[in-house]
Amino acid sequence: MGHGKKVATFTSPHIGSINDRICINGQPIADADFIRLAEQVKEMEKTLLQTHDQLSFFELLTLIAFLYFRDQEVDLVLLEVGIGGLLDTTNVVTGELAVITSIGLDHQETLGDSLEAIAEQKAGIFKAGKKAVIAKLPSETRLVCQKKADSLAVDLYQAGQDFSMLNGDFSSSLANLSQLKIGLEGTYQQENAALALQTFLLFMREGKEAVDEQVVRQALEKTHWAGRLERIRPQIYLDGAHNLPALTRLVEFVKEKEQEGYRPQILFGALKRKDYQGMLSYLTENLPQVELKVTGFDYQGSLDETDVTGYHVIPSYREFISSFEERADTKDLLFITGSLYFISEVRSHILGHEQIN
């Protein structure tokens, strides 16, 4: 956006309102536009139903997003896959750049029960003759991506090999930038920033457009992502880690805070259909000194006290958060995590409570 582009984003799930999934230059789609396009899609669906099944919720939203972005004549669309890639609703477009940020065991019932199988699904977004950028991945998944790229004549750029960032210094054949500041907390965010920066530089090179280094620096420093290691209060972090790869990164950050002398504790809420036992075990094993509490939330299918044994169960996260804020001192930190749906609900509660008071 800093380079004058009209940038659209389609993400899921939403953290605030459903409009947040469909944005242009950071501004969510207006209610009037959403309703107008939803009515168009429902009319289209009437014809579709003669030969096909009813559209899913995600398919409806994807269509609304595509129509909105077309009407608004955007320059660039950042399109986040819903699940996997190969068979995902979003994979009907031919993107100039495909990006894989991580590969871990998640949605096994749909994507397969091995890292290699999931990598096959994720690499399904690679398009013949285009470009792809991947994070630093385990060797078995990296090889799957490389094989897929080779079969489609895709130019593949790999973190740690073709580009990297260490201590704020970005290195790539496209550019070298030093002393960059990242707005998002957590050392691991440098890896995410490197991935985003490499993708941006490739996009700009493809369009033969000049890069303003100062704009890049300002953009990285101002980056904010709701529900992703978000410091919503001075002593409360929200992080939508909902699988083991994401949880690994959160644990890294919690350990950093422990080393700085803070006393972190974790409030965990998840969906029953997720591998919550594996996530809880991972937290217990890797953060043995950190208080871990489990709670339910209003979303259908969330954990409750009958699903977990051996953990401190909190009946009401609302009362717990209120109590924490009343008694916490400057070295106490609360990390709320386990599910993006949980984070969305907690975030609305905290911000809504602030508005009321």
Locations of regions flagged by a protein language model:
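Active-site-proximal loop/hinge segments that shape catalytic or ion-binding/gating pockets
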Residues: S339
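Acidic, Mg2+-coordinating active-site environments of NTP-dependent enzymes
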Residues: L48-L49, Q72-L76, E80, G95-L180, ...
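C-terminal helical cap/extension that packs against the catalytic core
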Residues: P138-L156, L166-G168, K274-F335
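Nucleotide phosphate-binding/pyrophosphate-handling subdomain across enzymes
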Residues: L76-L79, T89-V99, I103-H107, A117, ...
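Beta-strand->loop->alpha-helix junctions that form or flank phosphate-binding loops
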Residues: F10-P13, A135-K136, K148-L166, G183-G186, ...
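Active-site-proximal loop->helix
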Residues: P13, S17-Q40, E109-F126, Q146-K147, ...
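ATP-dependent carboxylate-amine ligase catalytic core
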Residues: G2-V93
